[in-house]
Amino acid sequence: MQILAPYLSRPDERGGFLGITQESWAEVNFIETRANQVRGNHYHKETRELFFIISGEIEVVIDDLNSGEHLELLFRKGDVFIIDPYEVHTFRTVTDAQWINMLSQAMDPQHPDFHQVAEKN
């Protein structure tokens, strides 16, 4: 997992401009989720994902299948992070939340790079 800082920030009297990423992404998605809901609990073998939180608070749990590292983080409006392949990621919305999700490769419905993990009891 990588937590990103903006590459450019230009506030002025009109509002502001925030540079999120200069990387190329193959797919861009908008996600809206009500408070206290869970999404994810899966990983990808090849796909990297960038997340940009537009509004709300989201608890993110990462379990790296390669290193065994376990992270629990809270993200808020304006936060940007990348999830790498083989990182199981689970999201729980603390509040209603909206975010942008970008994938390094477009999801192929015939052969999705999407691997669900069994829920823990």
Regions from the language model: what does each represent?
Residues 10-41:
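A short glycine-rich, His/Asp/Glu-containing loop-to-beta-strand
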